[in-house]
A protein has these predicted regions:
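A short, highly charged nucleic-acid-interacting micro-segment common to nuclease
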Residues: 4-19, 71-87
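Extracellular secretory-pathway ectodomains and N-terminal mature segments of eukaryotic proteins
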Residues: 6, 49, 105-109, 213, ...
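Conserved catalytic core of two-metal-ion nucleotidyltransferases
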Residues: 30-34, 80-138
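Helical scaffold of the NTase/Pol beta-like nucleotidyltransferase catalytic core
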Residues: 1-43
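Short loop/turn segments at strand-loop or loop-helix junctions that form parts
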Residues: 1-2, 64-70, 132-133
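Generic detector of well-ordered alpha-helical segments enriched in charged/polar residues
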Residues: 13, 17-20, 24-27, 88-95, ...
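Active-site nucleotide-donor binding segment shared across nucleotidyl transfer reactions
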Residues: 29-61, 65-76
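Catalytic cores of NTP-dependent nucleotidyl/adenyl transfer enzymes across multiple folds
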Residues: 111-221
Length: 221
């Protein structure tokens, strides 16, 4: 295993090209069926150009897929035989399409996690997390797994309130380019490197989003 390294811009651009291709596929598929419409938003480390490779050389990107008011709402979810929630049906639609589209398991893998659909490019060693958000009226609901005790192995998803802690992002936008560079290079990146060196299963790992918010809020305080 190697050291924790910052991802080169060319590698990030290649992974962003893959992400855009996947998103185009999703748009074309669901628009053709007049089922869902959504916009996409790059978030997290890639947005600020502070992506790190782990010890195995892997790195990840994060996208939010914002379902708009134009998506065709499927009614009577709870009246079908399997009594699936609206969130479950939507998550399954997106996951099943991608799982079939990128079915070559020598090249790709798809994982259905608590909140995200994770696309993994095994050869290029990167992953992309796609999180589904109900964008209207307030961009404040995210799909999250909520399996029941009676059927813990059956994936069930619900809409959960999304944290609206945007003050850190507003403050970051107000900073000058020089301040942003200082904050990223001297405060955020060193902490991300420390966390990246930990075991992935360590329950005490601090997320990149938390590091970002904490360091922005503390900057200049």
């Amino acid at each position: 295993m190697g050291k924790i390294k910052r991802v080169h811009k060319k590698e990030i651009n290649n992974s962003l090209d893959q992400a855009r291709s996947i998103i185009r596929d999703l748009h074309e598929h669901f628009n053709a069926g007049k089922k869902y419409k959504f916009t996409e938003r790059l978030v997290g480390s890639a947005k600020w150009n502070i992506v790190l490779k782990d010890k195995n050389g892997f790195f990840d990107l994060d996208y939010q897929l914002l379902l708009t008011k134009n998506f065709k709402k499927i009614k009577n979810y709870d009246k079908n035989v399997e009594k699936k929630t609206e969130a479950t049906m939507i998550k399954e639609d997106f996951f099943n399409y991608l799982n079939e589209k990128y079915s070559d398991r020598e090249k790709y893998d798809l994982q259905n996690s608590t909140t995200a659909i994770t696309f993994i490019n095994k050869k290029a060693k990167f992953s992309i997390d796609f999180v589904l958000i109900k964008s209207l009226p307030d961009n404040n609901q995210i799909i999250r797994r909520d399996n029941t005790k009676e059927n813990p192995t059956i994936n069930r998803y619900v809409w959960n309130e999304l944290s609206m802690n945007n003050e850190a992002y507003k403050k970051f936008k107000r900073l000058s380019p020089k301040q942003k560079e200082d904050l990223i290079e001297n405060y955020i990146l060193p902490r991300k490197i420390i966390e990246k060196q930990k075991d992935p299963n360590d329950p005490n790992i601090i997320s990149s989003s938390r590091i970002f918010k904490e360091e922005v809020n503390n900057y200049g305080a």
